[in-house]
């Protein structure tokens, strides 16, 4: 049966655990299992786009199963060759296809055929048209076969990509700024007045700071276009703060507690946990260190790499909210001192700013009105 499934703005942790065991026990009723499928993705993927076929736990599920965890802490020039973004996309498309089929038919199919139009972005420092074409071709060149497991039941999803567009990081964020509306600029306008509106960012010189879990991208944009040679990526982010915090916590409690980084973060969020105060204190200390490193990188790029030729420093990304209390005042003081401005994207929009921009590009540029999947 053909299902023309074109998912939109699906979000999931960029984490994969390879060589996991296929589920053998049915834990939940069917409707609950389908509803939670994107958070419980285990899939066998057979695709020439991957170095080898395999069974993977994907996204949130990879935090709880499998001995090996692979995430998107990607080195320079690596994302277009890495298997993780391909595994993530195929798993998400397959799970969404099963959810959509079940929504309309109230039963699991044995197999589904899916057609997809997909957009994504490569790091600006990695991007050039030939590299983008190679990455696009990994999706376009064949049918990808995914057996996605709903509890212990496999559903075969055959995925064909009709169109794929790879742009460079920075471009989607600028489109999101231009189309973002007053809510995005409320704090900015409170600090600097109403003189600069959303549309004006198309012609301004921007230092975009995209703070993630394992990496922070520093993207220099002039009149809407990233200047690739002046963009950098550093291994700063929330994940690194958590790693440092876990070490500080271990030193503080002085007992041998076996705990992964993910389990440590659960203690941080659980206010009733016996060790919550110590874990939270360790994380706050570690965040200060990471904040200082990010701020130092911003000032160094601004003053040296970019020779001060910046109108606005724009901070966003999934990790930006965690660092705002430690960074915002110091960053604003710095930008004020060099006749520039700070735009810290609100936490409601910051994690999805790239996805918002890709949706705009899908409608206005890439696919012109077609609802398409996108990924970061």
Please place each PLM-identified region on the residue numbering.
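A mobile "lid/hinge" subdomain adjacent to the ATP/sugar-phosphate binding pocket shared
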Residues: 249-285
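A short acidic Gly-Thr/Ser loop motif
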Residues: 1, 199-216, 221-224, 235-238, ...
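Short coil/turn segments at secondary-structure junctions
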Residues: 73-80, 229, 278-282
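Detector for glycine-centered tight turns/loop "hinges" at secondary-structure junctions
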Residues: 5, 224-225, 272-273
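Contiguous effector/interaction surfaces
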Residues: 286-290
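Conserved short-loop catalytic and cofactor-binding motifs
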Residues: 233, 282, 346
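Glycine-rich phosphate-binding loop plus the immediately following alpha-helix
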Residues: 19-30, 170-185, 213, 219-259, ...
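Nucleotide/phosphate-binding catalytic cleft detector across ATP-hydrolyzing
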Residues: 2-206, 292-315, 320-376
